Amino acid sequence: MCICKNGKPLPGFIGKICRKICMMQQTH
């Protein structure tokens, strides 16, 4: 799962994709 809830996505392109998925899914 992504770690965007903290507002600090993983570093690198992985974080970029993670952030995109989080934005698309938005699982709060």
UniProtKB/Swiss-Prot annotation:
Keyword Nucleus carried by entry: no
Keyword Secreted: yes
Keywords: Disulfide bond, Mast cell degranulation, Secreted
Disulfide bond sites: 2-18, 4-22
Organism domain of life: Eukaryota
Coiled coil (residue ranges): none
CC annotations in GO: extracellular region
Reported tissue expression: Expressed by the venom gland.
Subcellular location: Secreted
Function: Mast cell degranulating peptide.
Name of this protein: Mast cell degranulating peptide
